[in-house]
Amino acid sequence: MALFRELVEAAEAAGRVSGRKEKVRILSEFLGRLSPEEASIAARFLAGHVFPEYDNRELGVGYSLVREALKVLDQKPLFLVEPQPPAITEVYRLLERIAGVSGEGSREKKLKLLEGLFSRLSRKEVEYLLRILFGEVRIGASTGLLLEAISRLSGVPYGDVLHAYMVLSDVGDVAFKALESPAALGKVDVSLFHPVKPMLADMAYNVDELFQEHGSPLHLEYKYDGLRVQIHMGRGKVRVFSRRLSDITEYVPDVVERAVEGLHVEEAVVDGEAVAVIGGAPVPFQELLRRVRRKNEREDFLKSLPFELHLFDVIYLNGKSLVREPYSTRSRLLREIVVSEEILAKKTVAYTRQEALEFYESAVRSGNEGVMSKRHSSVYKPGIRGSDWLKLKSFDTIDCVIIAAEWGHGRRSGWLSDYHLGVYDEESGRFLSVGKTFKGLSDAEFEEMTKRLLQLKVREEGYVVYVKPEIVVEVDYSEIQRSKRYPSGFALRFARIRRIRFDKSPYEVTTLRELRERYLRSIRAKRWSPQ
């Protein structure tokens, strides 16, 4: 039975070497010594997760509770026999128990469980455990490194391992299958009622760029400002999943109704956007959510919203995965299973620059964000952002995660209101700062954000509160600049929060690679114009 101590030693060993191949070797050899269950848990821990990414359980362990539990380290009797160090599986089971504690007296129960766990760990092991709990940094490797390690130990090609991860949505599940049945890992595919990560789009800055990348003709769709939904239908059931893979079926009855009425099919998994419509016009969904402050209130609010459904892809049909089929085939099959094309995203084929511009302008006039262009030959790549899909928006933003916040002054005194913004570095598995801003939110949002951020507090230094990277915000900016001040090497000029993205996970934010690409493009074209 592998000890948690061994995981920490492997993480430290991987952290000490600089070469990617050597990191992969260390992680591969460590995971290869474990049972499938142990490897599953260890892979998640090394990636900075306790539970699978699609698992909505929360530990509910805050900074103050941890600080109190840490006192047990200073109270260990020196004359007693050292307690048995916990196995990796024991640590996981204890964290499961902590997540399951609720109701009256839950804080005291969680405290006792944490104290019991901390008392069996060394200070170094506690440090690593806290980094897992707070998601402060990935403790051993980025997900990419772990997938390479899994490929090495299983002998399964990296492309197949990556595909399995995108379908299973959990590096732990991939590690389990790699050790239990490597041959089966290469056959993992989309299945009914198991949500997969949605395919994502790169940003384009003008119509000419769409033609340069995708050629003529362009296959364009409206880009809606709604709720990304993945709908699974079959066996007499309908399930709706969010982009974070949460089951939101009960909160969107309109979406379920429109799917049942609009699709004529035995089994299917379709991808689309649910758009809130008030007074016959689309309303920016995230703007509506800004009015609702608490999570349970947001869920009730969702139920009350009238939604229209706009489908744009089908990735599973009557027992067969379609993710390896070209977009042209998937688009045709989607048209064949809808009762009426009203349920489809509005599309066109543009042969000329003028036709593309007119479609873009009609999308914006209709209250939408812009347009999407999709390469006709592209396969569906779950969880992958790339140039096969390009989005052209009427405004330019990036998604950042809040990694720290500062106490405000003057009118904002008493609120955490100056937010440190981070992008994701895929190489290191860390979130790196690109600047900070206090602009864009209302007083009510400052108040609610202060409560949420304090619940996510990891530590406090002076007037800066460092938090678990959990809250995603969409950020406007005027320019990306080179900067030695921030670890990312870049800074956002005149950053302003456009909206809070409750629907996005921290690992969906803009990556450092994407930010670097935007910076290089901005050198060529300082001011963006759709024309």
Swiss-Prot record:
PROSITE patterns: DNA_LIGASE_A3 (PS50160). Keywords: ATP-binding, Cell cycle, Cell division, DNA damage, DNA recombination, DNA repair, DNA replication, Ligase, Magnesium, Metal-binding, Nucleotide-binding. The keyword Nucleotide-binding applies. CDD domains: Adenylation_DNA_ligase_Arch_LigB. It comes from the Archaea. SUPFAM superfamilies: ATP-dependent DNA ligase DNA-binding domain, DNA ligase/mRNA capping enzyme, catalytic domain, Nucleic acid-binding proteins. This is DNA ligase 1. It comes from Thermofilum pendens (strain DSM 2475 / Hrk 5). The lineage of its organism: Archaea, Thermoproteota, Thermoprotei, Thermofilales, Thermofilaceae.
